[in-house]
Structure formats: C-alpha cells, structure tokens
Amino acid sequence: MNRVISYTIATLLLAITTARSSAQEATDTKQLQEVVVMGGKHKTLSNRGTRILGAIHMLTPDKVGYEVGSALSAKQPFEVEEIEFFIISNSIRDVTLQVAIYRDSTFTEVFSQPIFVNIPEGNRQTVVAKPTERILLQPGDYIVSIGLDDCDGETQQQWANSDQWDGQKRYQMMTKQNLQFPLYFKAGQIRSNPDDAFEKCPTNIGLKVKGVIHKPRH
C-alpha cells in the first residue's frame, strides 16, 4: 500500500514538473516570436576604443575568479551569436576561461548555461565562444566579461603562496606563466571575484559580441 502511495505521489510530482517545464518553454517561445529579424542584419557590439601598441593585460595562475570586461549597450533587441576576443600568448597549462554577459544594473548573468572555453598554450589566438542556448538581449546596458575559471592543478599549487613572494620572485614566475591580452584605450570593467561588484578601469581587452538585430513586432 505504501509503495502504491509513494508511486502515485512521485507520478504526480513528475507530471507537475513536466507541466511547469512545458509552460516555461511556451512562454519563452512566445517571447521569441514577439520579435522579427530585420532582414537578418548582423551587428557587432564593441566598446574597445584605440589599441595601445605594446601594452598588454596579463593574467597569472593566482587570478582564478578574476574577471575583466567591457560595458556594452543594446539599442534594439539583439540576439547573441558569439563572443570574440584575441589572446596574444598563453603559457599556462590547461587554462579554462568563463565567458559571461551581465545586466549592468543588477550584475545578473544572462546565460543560464555558462560558457567555458579551453585555451591551449601558444601565441596569437582568436577565440570565439558561442552560447549553447538562444540569448536575446533586450535594449539596455550590459557587461561582457571573461574570467579565469581554472588551470592546471600543479601550477595552482606553485602559485599558492604568491602573496608572500618578493618582487623578483613574482617577476620570474610571471614571465614563465601568464595569459596575455591586447589593451585598448577605453574604459573597461574588472572584479577580483564573483562576490564583488565590477569596477571601472581605464582600459579594456577588446571583447566583441556578434549577433543579429531584431525589431519588436507591431
């Protein structure tokens, strides 16, 4: 008897969950149907400014959780297809970066499924990250960022006490293990860990968000 009751309850819970999921999918579909593509017009959202020749933004293995990005504005509904950035060089093993877009006013992440990108060691890499879900940005202000999510465990162990190094030791390690980005002369956004708010800085690393402009249905 108890097994029958338990099975019945489980069946009801599954039915409720399925109904809620279907309702949410229907709502999402309706929201997407409320816009139409303006002739498939593609656009790049970028706020990078002028390249600073010879200048770099450097990440080291002790910067796990650190994010760097740019503030962007969408004037019309904008469907995100990919985020692009350039890496000058990488000498850190097994680097994983997380790519994110946040609503500027609340720092709420737009992606429900995080985007992770593995970066091999090497020079001059153009990285293209594509969302695994359909993302439609409503008109407003956003922050697009990349963060150092992870790297080789042995390397992290080597950097575990980096806050105790003197200047010479830090310089030696930084020249051996680093991830370098180009710098552009226009305000960017940085934060040391996900619990902090973003802060403005005078430069950015040239992130670009590519996609399609949409127009509200009248």
Task: List the predicted regions and their residue ranges.
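Exposed aromatic-hydrophobic patches
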Residues: 124-134
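Short, aromatic- and glycine-rich surface loops/edge beta-strands on solvent-exposed regions
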Residues: 142-146
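Bacterial Sec-dependent N-terminal signal peptides
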Residues: 1-26
